[in-house]
C-alpha cells in the first residue's frame, strides 16, 4: 500500500493503493497498473478516483483527475461527525461515530485517508467484512453521505434547529 500526500493549492491528495494487473492474450500477458486516490479540501469536500494505465505515474494522474471531478460535500461538526453512521458497498461495511476533541482519527487504511482529506479530525471508525481499498473508500463515502446535520433534519421536518436539538 503506497501513501503519497501532496497539497495542490488548497486540495490534499492522497494515494491509497497502486496495483499491478494483467490481461492474458494469445502472446502472453499485458501488464498495467491501477491507482486509487482521494482528494479533499480538509473542510468537508472529498472525492475519490480510480485510474488505470500502462505506467504507474499515468495511472496516478488519471486517478487524481477523476477524484477532483467527483468531489462531494459532506456535513461536518467542527472536525467530527454529527452522529454515528454506517455505510456499505458490496462486501465492505463501515461504522463511524463522533469522538471528543483530542481523540484523533482512529481508523484503518483506506478509511483513514478519506477521513483525513475530508477534514475529519476526531472519529472512531471500524471496517467490517472485506477490506478491499476500493470498496472501503466507497463504503466510507456512503456513510459520510448518509450523515445529516441538525439544519438538514430541521428543514426536512419543518421545525427549528432548537426543537430538533431539544
UniProtKB/Swiss-Prot annotation:
Family assignment from sequence similarity = Belongs to the universal ribosomal protein uS5 family.
Pfam families xref list = Ribosomal_S5 (PF00333), Ribosomal_S5_C (PF03719)
Name-wise, this protein is Small ribosomal subunit protein uS5
Report the protein's function. With S4 and S12 plays an important role in translational accuracy. Located at the back of the 30S subunit body where it stabilizes the conformation of the head with respect to the body.
Q: Which InterPro entries does UniProt cross-reference here?
A: Ribosomal_Su5_D2-typ_SF (IPR020568), Ribosomal_uS5 (IPR000851), Ribosomal_uS5_bac-type (IPR005712), Ribosomal_uS5_C (IPR005324), Ribosomal_uS5_N (IPR013810), Ribosomal_uS5_N_CS (IPR018192), Ribsml_uS5_D2-typ_fold_subgr (IPR014721)
Q: Which residues form the S5 DRBM domain?
A: 11-74
Q: Does RNA-binding appear among the keywords?
A: yes
Give the molecular function GO annotations: rRNA binding; structural constituent of ribosome
* GO BP terms in the entry: translation
Source organism of this protein record: Photorhabdus laumondii subsp. laumondii (strain DSM 15139 / CIP 105565 / TT01)
The domain section of the record reads: The N-terminal domain interacts with the head of the 30S subunit; the C-terminal domain interacts with the body and contacts protein S4. The interaction surface between S4 and S5 is involved in control of translational fidelity.
Amino acid at each position: 500500500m503506497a501513501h503519497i500526500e501532496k497539497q495542490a493549492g488548497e486540495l490534499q491528495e492522497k494515494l491509497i493503493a497502486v496495483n499491478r494487473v494483467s490481461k492474458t492474450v494469445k502472446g502472453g500477458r499485458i501488464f498495467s497498473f491501477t491507482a486509487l486516490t482521494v482528494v479533499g479540501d480538509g473542510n468537508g469536500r472529498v472525492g475519490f478516483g480510480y485510474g488505470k494505465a500502462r505506467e504507474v505515474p499515468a495511472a496516478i494522474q488519471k486517478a487524481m483527475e477523476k477524484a477532483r471531478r467527483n468531489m462531494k460535500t459532506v456535513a461536518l461538526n467542527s472536525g467530527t461527525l454529527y452522529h454515528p453512521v454506517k455505510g456499505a458497498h458490496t462486501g465492505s461495511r463501515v461504522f463511524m461515530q463522533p469522538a471528543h476533541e483530542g481523540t484523533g482519527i482512529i481508523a484503518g487504511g483506506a478509511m483513514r485517508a478519506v477521513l483525513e482529506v475530508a477534514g475529519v479530525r476526531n472519529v472512531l471508525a471500524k471496517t467490517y467484512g472485506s477490506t478491499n481499498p476500493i470498496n472501503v473508500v466507497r463504503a466510507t463515502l456512503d456513510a459520510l453521505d448518509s450523515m445529516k446535520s441538525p439544519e438538514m433534519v430541521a428543514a426536512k421536518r419543518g421545525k427549528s434547529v432548537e426543537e430538533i436539538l431539544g
